Amino acid sequence: SIFYGKLKEIYSNTVFLDGDTLREVFGNDLGYSDTDRRKCAMRYSRLCDLLQKQGIHVVCCTISMFDSVRQWNRENIANYHEIYVEVSDETLQKRDQKGLYSRYQSGDETELAGFQVGIETPKNPDLVLWNDGEKTPEEQAEIMMQTWKINN
């Protein structure tokens, strides 16, 4: 969201889409099975494509689990940039921002991406950021700005 804020300062026609928020916007009508996750991902991709075609800059943050969806994005969304934010399982579990990992460890979470549910990690992202806490979110956002030569 910090990158979005920096981008919005330059391009007022910028929107931020978050996967969890989008699930709510679409009525939480899909579950967490592989089929539902794929449907959900394609909804987000088509929405990003629609907005981009209307001249809107889109920053969309999702778990992005599927190669086929990322390929669709590359083939259909103009100026698509894929950023892969890597983080260790240990760091994810330590942060546990949504309580998912503690629910997983207690057996209450049964479809946790990256644990019970496989993730197809990106093969050729445009940028890889390591989110281990060594760099601040502001520094990570600046790396993104520099990568695409966006001047603020």
Give the role of each language-model region.
Residues S1-R46:
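Conserved substrate/cofactor phosphate-moiety recognition/catalytic segment
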Residues I10, N76-A78, N124:
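Short, structured coil segments at secondary-structure junctions
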Residues N13-V15, I56, H81, P125:
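The start of beta-strands in P-loop NTPase/AAA+ ATPase cores
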Residues T21-R23, S64-D67, E86-T91, E134-K135:
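Conserved nucleotide-binding/hydrolysis micro-motifs of P-loop NTPases
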Residues V25, S33-H81, Y101-Y104, E111-G114:
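Glycine-rich phosphate-binding loop used to anchor ATP phosphates in small-molecule kinases
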Residues V59-C61, N76-R95, L129:
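Conserved phosphate-donor/acceptor-positioning beta-strand/loop module used by diverse small-molecule
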Residues K94-N152:
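Small-molecule kinase domains that catalyze NTP-dependent phosphoryl transfer to phosphate-bearing small molecules
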